[in-house]
Protein backbone atom coordinates (compact mmCIF):
# COMPACT_ATOMS: atom_id res chain seq x y z
CA UNK A 1 0.00 0.00 0.00
CA UNK A 2 1.32 3.45 -0.89
CA UNK A 3 2.33 5.87 1.84
CA UNK A 4 -0.46 8.31 0.96
CA UNK A 5 -3.39 5.87 0.85
CA UNK A 6 -4.74 6.52 4.36
CA UNK A 7 -4.51 10.27 3.82
CA UNK A 8 -6.69 9.76 0.75
CA UNK A 9 -9.23 7.77 2.79
CA UNK A 10 -9.38 10.46 5.48
CA UNK A 11 -9.67 13.23 2.85
CA UNK A 12 -12.50 11.36 1.10
CA UNK A 13 -14.41 10.94 4.36
CA UNK A 14 -13.92 14.57 5.38
CA UNK A 15 -14.89 15.96 1.97
CA UNK A 16 -17.92 13.67 1.90
CA UNK A 17 -18.96 15.00 5.32
CA UNK A 18 -18.24 18.54 4.04
CA UNK A 19 -20.87 18.16 1.31
CA UNK A 20 -23.42 16.58 3.65
CA UNK A 21 -23.04 19.45 6.13
CA UNK A 22 -23.17 22.00 3.29
CA UNK A 23 -26.44 20.44 2.15
CA UNK A 24 -27.85 20.67 5.69
CA UNK A 25 -26.68 24.27 6.10
CA UNK A 26 -27.82 25.52 2.69
CA UNK A 27 -31.50 25.76 3.59
CA UNK A 28 -30.69 27.52 6.87
CA UNK A 29 -28.13 30.19 5.90
CA UNK A 30 -27.38 32.40 2.90
CA UNK A 31 -24.70 31.23 0.48
CA UNK A 32 -22.36 34.16 1.17
CA UNK A 33 -22.58 33.98 4.95
CA UNK A 34 -22.55 30.18 4.90
CA UNK A 35 -19.49 30.15 2.67
CA UNK A 36 -17.76 32.63 4.95
CA UNK A 37 -18.51 30.55 8.04
CA UNK A 38 -17.21 27.42 6.28
CA UNK A 39 -13.99 29.05 5.13
CA UNK A 40 -13.36 30.94 8.40
CA UNK A 41 -13.80 27.69 10.32
CA UNK A 42 -11.45 25.95 7.90
CA UNK A 43 -8.85 28.69 8.38
CA UNK A 44 -9.19 28.39 12.16
CA UNK A 45 -8.75 24.60 11.95
CA UNK A 46 -5.55 25.05 9.94
CA UNK A 47 -4.33 27.68 12.40
CA UNK A 48 -4.80 25.17 15.24
CA UNK A 49 -2.82 22.62 13.21
CA UNK A 50 0.01 25.13 12.65
CA UNK A 51 0.01 25.99 16.36
CA UNK A 52 0.26 22.28 17.17
CA UNK A 53 3.25 21.93 14.84
CA UNK A 54 4.92 24.97 16.41
CA UNK A 55 4.34 23.86 19.99
CA UNK A 56 5.53 20.30 19.37
CA UNK A 57 8.67 21.45 17.51
CA UNK A 58 7.51 19.78 14.29
CA UNK A 59 7.44 23.02 12.30
CA UNK A 60 8.67 22.45 8.77
CA UNK A 61 6.59 24.97 6.86
CA UNK A 62 8.55 26.55 4.02
CA UNK A 63 7.17 28.74 1.29
CA UNK A 64 8.04 30.50 -1.92
CA UNK A 65 6.30 33.35 -3.69
CA UNK A 66 4.91 30.89 -6.23
CA UNK A 67 3.70 28.60 -3.46
CA UNK A 68 1.82 31.48 -1.86
CA UNK A 69 0.42 32.57 -5.24
CA UNK A 70 -0.93 29.10 -6.04
CA UNK A 71 -2.29 28.78 -2.49
CA UNK A 72 -4.19 32.05 -2.97
CA UNK A 73 -5.62 30.76 -6.26
CA UNK A 74 -6.62 27.57 -4.45
CA UNK A 75 -8.38 29.62 -1.79
CA UNK A 76 -10.28 31.58 -4.42
CA UNK A 77 -11.40 28.33 -6.05
CA UNK A 78 -12.43 26.79 -2.71
CA UNK A 79 -14.37 29.91 -1.72
CA UNK A 80 -16.17 30.19 -5.05
CA UNK A 81 -16.79 26.43 -5.12
CA UNK A 82 -18.30 26.54 -1.64
CA UNK A 83 -20.67 29.32 -2.70
CA UNK A 84 -21.56 27.34 -5.85
CA UNK A 85 -22.45 24.29 -3.75
CA UNK A 86 -24.58 26.40 -1.39
CA UNK A 87 -26.44 27.82 -4.40
CA UNK A 88 -26.82 24.37 -5.95
CA UNK A 89 -28.44 23.03 -2.77
CA UNK A 90 -30.56 26.15 -2.19
CA UNK A 91 -32.03 25.73 -5.66
CA UNK A 92 -32.99 22.11 -5.03
CA UNK A 93 -29.92 20.31 -6.34
CA UNK A 94 -29.72 16.84 -4.79
CA UNK A 95 -26.87 15.73 -2.56
CA UNK A 96 -26.62 12.64 -4.76
CA UNK A 97 -25.44 14.85 -7.64
CA UNK A 98 -22.24 15.79 -5.80
CA UNK A 99 -20.23 12.66 -6.69
CA UNK A 100 -20.76 13.27 -10.41
CA UNK A 101 -19.88 16.95 -9.98
CA UNK A 102 -16.70 16.04 -8.12
CA UNK A 103 -15.95 13.44 -10.80
CA UNK A 104 -16.01 16.30 -13.31
CA UNK A 105 -13.35 18.00 -11.20
CA UNK A 106 -11.45 14.73 -11.05
CA UNK A 107 -11.54 14.55 -14.85
CA UNK A 108 -10.17 18.09 -15.03
CA UNK A 109 -7.36 17.12 -12.64
CA UNK A 110 -6.55 13.97 -14.60
CA UNK A 111 -6.34 15.94 -17.85
CA UNK A 112 -4.09 18.53 -16.19
CA UNK A 113 -1.92 15.74 -14.77
CA UNK A 114 -1.41 14.27 -18.22
CA UNK A 115 -0.98 17.55 -20.12
CA UNK A 116 0.93 19.72 -17.65
CA UNK A 117 2.53 17.44 -15.06
CA UNK A 118 3.70 14.74 -17.48
CA UNK A 119 1.81 11.96 -15.71
CA UNK A 120 1.58 8.93 -17.99
CA UNK A 121 -1.77 8.49 -19.72
CA UNK A 122 -3.35 5.06 -19.61
CA UNK A 123 -6.54 3.63 -21.01
CA UNK A 124 -7.92 3.49 -17.45
CA UNK A 125 -7.33 7.21 -16.90
CA UNK A 126 -8.78 8.12 -20.28
CA UNK A 127 -11.85 5.94 -19.59
CA UNK A 128 -12.23 7.54 -16.16
CA UNK A 129 -12.13 11.01 -17.69
CA UNK A 130 -14.74 10.03 -20.28
CA UNK A 131 -17.04 8.45 -17.67
CA UNK A 132 -16.74 11.51 -15.42
CA UNK A 133 -17.72 13.84 -18.25
CA UNK A 134 -20.61 11.56 -19.22
CA UNK A 135 -21.72 11.58 -15.56
CA UNK A 136 -21.90 15.37 -15.57
CA UNK A 137 -24.16 15.33 -18.63
CA UNK A 138 -26.39 12.69 -17.02
CA UNK A 139 -27.06 15.14 -14.17
CA UNK A 140 -29.07 17.36 -16.50
CA UNK A 141 -32.08 15.03 -16.28
Q: Model-predicted segments: where are they?
A:
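Membrane-interface interhelical linkers
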Residues: 1-13, 22, 27-32, 37-72, ...
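Alpha-helical structural signal
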Residues: 10-11, 85, 105, 113, ...
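Hydrophobic/small/kink-forming positions within alpha-helical transmembrane segments
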Residues: 12, 16, 20, 47, ...
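Residue-level "edge-of-site" marker
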Residues: 39, 101, 129
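Alpha-helix boundary/capping detector
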Residues: 50-52, 102, 114-115
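C-terminal transmembrane-helix exit sites in multi-pass transporters
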Residues: 106-123
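Hydrophobic transmembrane alpha-helices of multi-pass small-molecule transport proteins
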Residues: 124-140
Amino acid sequence: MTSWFWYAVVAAILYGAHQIFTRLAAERIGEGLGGFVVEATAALSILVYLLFLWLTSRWDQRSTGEGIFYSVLTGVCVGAGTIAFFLLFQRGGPLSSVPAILAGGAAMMAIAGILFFREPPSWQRIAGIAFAIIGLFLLRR
